[in-house]
Curated annotation (Swiss-Prot):
It is a peripheral membrane protein. Vacuolar protein sorting-associated protein involved in Golgi-to-vacuole protein transport. The lineage of its organism: Eukaryota, Fungi, Dikarya, Ascomycota, Taphrinomycotina. It is found in: Cytoplasm; Nucleus; Vacuole membrane. InterPro entries: Sec-1-like_dom1, Sec-1-like_dom3a, Sec1-like, Sec1-like_dom2, Sec1-like_sf. One of its GO terms (cellular component) is cytosol. Disruption phenotype: displays an accumulation of abnormal vesicular structures and leads to valproic acid sensitivity. One of its GO terms (molecular function) is SNARE binding. Belongs to the STXBP/unc-18/SEC1 family. PANTHER family: VESICLE PROTEIN SORTING-ASSOCIATED. GO terms for biological process: Golgi vesicle fusion to target membrane; intracellular protein transport; vesicle-mediated transport. This is Vacuolar protein sorting-associated protein 45. It comes from the Eukaryota. The gene is vps45. Keywords: Cytoplasm, Membrane, Nucleus, Protein transport, Transport, Vacuole.
């Protein structure tokens, strides 16, 4: 189960089926999907003459063929019908990212007066490929007017994304879901209905062990998206945001105020692929070695030029050297900027307080630590994160201090509208609305265990936290995941598979996944033979996106 391989094999087939120079016709969503899988140079190698957007004004190029890669939506249908009534290319080969309704095909046929359409196929790639085991449906908000109600568009898009994901991986799964989530239940029922209704599409060879589709609700772990991150990929997303593989940041060490945009793609960048899950301390060592490698290569090349033949050999290798040099420069600039933000935001102290708050027994000093940081020179977002984490931890233990923190935020100049995030968060993902506990239990046994942990020490004080997903997946793989918390949708499949240890697991987090969870999944795939996990989220969260989503909910929940 490799999303990068699946997506690349799709595009390889598409471009091989349509020979000669061609136009690639996309729309807004599929532009993002294509750019998450293929580079511009790959497109040129496949004889793509031009990439254009459906609905934009374009000149007619009747000597060229057109490959269209589109989502089967009402908007796409309308624009495509207009295109076919006045075709701009010699012939059209239509590839859709998902199941095409019969009515859709009928409308296309009615509009194709010039018989320009030569082929129509379904290629199931209705999601963004982030890592080889991580996908996103790119939906920032999913709630309508209550924590239990989907927005219609978000529900339809998530459902389509899951169906496409299952079909691209060739899996007909057994479905389990968070028992306390009406969002997950509705989604599970709709996915199950589609699997039954499209039985021919899901007519795969029956495996020895049924794959599992596990639907989880973000509300059961509101902690993970709020924490400071300390591994490379997660840090970049937390501090700058990764938007479909692109990162923009301002270089604070330069007089130039223009932002820098770079591309981070583990498929194309071996250094990034190797280091994306490294913690910040190890990353500094790897960057130093990477720079030393470049310097050694540069010195060696220069000293070896003694003849015309040597010069020719150097020039032939020069493009590769320039590429390596550019990549080194990119990562040095990015890590340097991360260091600046860590220092400016006092993230070392913030991170230590956060980890103590969520991983250890509640302490009387926790409030003083948070209070001191709230009145320090850190950003509004960091203050909100700290207050939100404290509120989630102490909402039952000391509600008066939770309320006092909100007043401190306002007194410290934080917009009251943003402060409303905290009561909304507690209403959506507080103790009464979660199942299982994301915090260590407060009892004598846990205190003894905490003491032992302290004696042994931890590998890194900043990465003590484990996402709640870890315990869920460990229980699932060991056959211990309770049906009271994660029931099977279908009682018949429950009887057949309840004692089986799954091998293929597709996890979808409604409300968004994080890079910390992706790190765990990747680690698990690398260390657990016989188990393969794919993680998908309605979006890929960082703390800013999560707080924005909670703020959005606060304006809509009645």
């Amino acid at each position: 189960m490799d999303l990068v391989s699946a997506s690349q094999s799709y595009f390889k087939r598409i471009f091989q089926e349509v020979s000669d120079l061609k136009i690639l016709l996309l729309e807004e969503d599929t532009t993002k999907i294509v750019s998450s899988c293929i580079t511009q140079s790959n497109l040129l190698e496949q004889q793509i003459y031009l990439t254009v957007l459906l609905g934009n004004k374009r000149e007619k190029l009747r000597h060229l063929k057109c490959v269209a890669f589109l989502r089967p939506t009402p908007t796409t249908l309308r624009l495509l019908c207009e295109e076919l009534r006045d075709p701009k290319y010699a012939e059209y080969h239509l590839y859709f990212t998902n199941v095409i309704p019969k009515s859709f095909l009928e409308r296309l046929a009615e509009s194709d007066d010039f018989e320009a359409v030569k082929s129509i196929q379904e290629f199931f790639l209705d999601y963004l490929v982030v890592n080889n085991d991580l996908a996103s449906f790119n939906i920032p908000h999913i709630i309508e007017d209550s924590p239990d109600n989907w927005q219609d568009g978000a529900f339809h898009r998530t459902h389509q994304g899951i169906i496409s994901l299952l079909l691209s991986l060739k899996k007909k799964p057994v479905i389990r879901y968070d028992n306390n989530s009406l969002l997950c239940l509705k989604l599970a029922e709709e996915v199950s209905y589609t699997i039954q209704h499209e039985s021919q599409l899901f007519n795969f060879r029956k495996p020895d062990t049924a794959p599992i589709l596990l639907l989880l609700d973000r509300k059961n772990d509101p902690i993970t998206p709020l924490l400071t991150q300390w591994t490379y990929q997660a840090m970049v997303h937390e501090l700058f945001g990764i938007d479909n593989g692109r990162v923009s940041f301002s270089n604070s060490t330069s007089d130039n105020e223009k932002s820098t945009e770079i591309v981070l793609n583990p498929t194309l960048d071996p250094f990034y692929k190797e280091t994306r899950f490294d913690n910040f301390g190890d990353l500094g060592v790897k960057i130093k070695d990477y720079v030393s490698h470049l310097q050694t290569k540069s010195t060696k090349k220069a000293s070896e030029i003694e003849s015309i033949a040597d010069m020719k050999q150097f020039l032939e290798a020069y493009p590769e050297y320039r590429r390596l040099s550019g990549n080194v420069s990119k990562h040095v600039s990015l890590v340097s900027e991360i260091s600046q933000v860590v220092q400016r935001e006092n993230l070392l102290e913030v991170g230590e307080v956060e980890q103590s708050l969520v991983c250890n027994e509640p302490q009387s000093t926790d409030f003083n630590d948070i209070q001191r940081l709230l009145f320090s020179n850190i950003s509004e977002n960091t203050k909100l994160r700290l207050a939100a984490l404290y509120s989630l931890r102490f909402e039952r233990i000391d509600p008066a201090k939770v309320s006092a923190l909100q007043q401190m935020l306002i007194a410290g100049g934080v917009n009251p509208l943003k402060v409303s995030v905290i009561p909304t968060l507690l209403h959506v993902a507080g103790y009464s609305f979660r199942q299982g506990d994301v915090f260590p239990p407060s009892n004598l046994f846990s205190r003894a265990r905490s003491g032992l942990k302290g004696l042994r020490g931890v590998e890194n004080v900043y990465i003590q936290h484990n996402p709640f997903l870890k315990s869920i997946l460990l229980d699932l793989i060991q056959g211990r995941l309770k049906e009271t918390t994660h029931p099977f949708l279908n009682s018949e499949t429950r009887a057949q598979t309840s004692n089986e240890k799954p091998q293929d697991i597709i996890v979808v987090i409604v409300g968004g996944a994080t890079y910390e969870e992706a790190h765990f999944v990747s680690e698990f795939n690398a260390t657990q033979p016989g188990v393969r996990i794919i993680l998908a989220g309605t979006t890929i969260l960082n703390s800013t996106a999560y707080i924005d989503d909670i703020m959005y909910m606060s304006t809509r929940i009645k």
